[in-house]
């Protein structure tokens, strides 16, 4: 990792933290999800970075992957538990962070469980340690609070222009995941729930990424859209909202996206729902492993 790469990672983390901490104050009952996410993304762009992925706002039993669509009218309900998940990148060097806001004080202990688990995981995180041991730490902290970790969600290795780079950081103990590597970047994200401790895919898809830009048999318009996506986002996730420059015809745009997913050119990420409709909390930081040191790039300013 060069000094220039490290500086870009640190700045991307600082910008994401700024957006997270400022916009989390605007998460209130009746607020439009679209307004919140557009504010997040605007702050990132105003600070000369780009969103690493579309801002996620997942409410109550929604664990992840809800991002508002074009003209989305969804609002934050009274008493909601709201996960705000966002990231920034500079030249493909990525940050990823999340916070949970509860509009009902009854869920504060649930929030504390995932937040304390994140703090414990970071304290124990170091090069050479078994990745499974981080899962053990997270699971122990969450269960001690009387909740369940979500076993099929977790953190991940991050590489340039690659948000999920193949290494999984579990929320429970697992064998055979290798060890934490120096000169690497990881997202750590404990999820806690009062439900069953697992997520399943919902029907809605609001986030996409490029899967295979070389699929044969695409129409000229579909190829134009693929080129537009690659030029602007590389292989990072994107929202239909970010394609309005390509087409202002929403129905045409959605139809093209749907067809490109079916043909295997794009990948869709379904919303993830807690299996027993339990309420979910999440906290997340990006950590940079540099020699024997750990740098939390997304810590509050």
From Swiss-Prot:
Q: Binding positions for substrate?
A: 65, 164
Q: Which cofactor does it need?
A: Co(2+); Zn(2+); Mn(2+); Fe(2+)
Q: How is the cofactor bound?
A: Binds 2 divalent metal cations per subunit. Has a high-affinity and a low affinity metal-binding site. The true nature of the physiological cofactor is under debate. The enzyme is active with cobalt, zinc, manganese or divalent iron ions. Most likely, methionine aminopeptidases function as mononuclear Fe(2+)-metalloproteases under physiological conditions, and the catalytically relevant metal-binding site has been assigned to the histidine-containing high-affinity site.
Q: Which InterPro entries match?
A: Creatinase/aminopeptidase-like, Met_Aminopeptidase_Type2, MetAP_archaeal, Pept_M24, Pept_M24_MAP, Pept_M24A_MAP2, Pept_M24A_MAP2_BS, WH-like_DNA-bd_sf
Residues bound to a divalent metal cation 2: 96, 156, 189, 284
A cellular component annotation (GO) from this entry: cytoplasm
Q: Name one GO biological process term.
A: proteolysis
Q: Which reaction does it catalyse?
A: Release of N-terminal amino acids, preferentially methionine, from peptides and arylamides
Q: Show the Gene3D superfamilies listed in the entry.
A: Creatinase/methionine aminopeptidase superfamily, Winged helix-like DNA-binding domain superfamily/Winged helix DNA-binding domain
Family annotation (PROSITE patterns) = MAP_2
Please, which domain of life does this record's source organism belong to? Archaea
* Claim: Magnesium is one of the keywords in the record: no
Give the first-level EC class, as a single word. hydrolase
**Which GO molecular function terms does the record list?**
aminopeptidase activity; initiator methionyl aminopeptidase activity; metal ion binding; metalloaminopeptidase activity; metalloexopeptidase activity
Relate the protein's function as given in its record: Removes the N-terminal methionine from nascent proteins. The N-terminal methionine is often cleaved when the second residue in the primary sequence is small and uncharged (Met-Ala-, Cys, Gly, Pro, Ser, Thr, or Val).
PANTHER family, per database record: METHIONINE AMINOPEPTIDASE 2 (PTHR45777:SF2)
Query: How does the record describe its quaternary structure?
Result: Monomer.
What name does UniProt use for this protein?
Methionine aminopeptidase
Gene source species: Saccharolobus solfataricus (strain ATCC 35092 / DSM 1617 / JCM 11322 / P2) (Sulfolobus solfataricus)
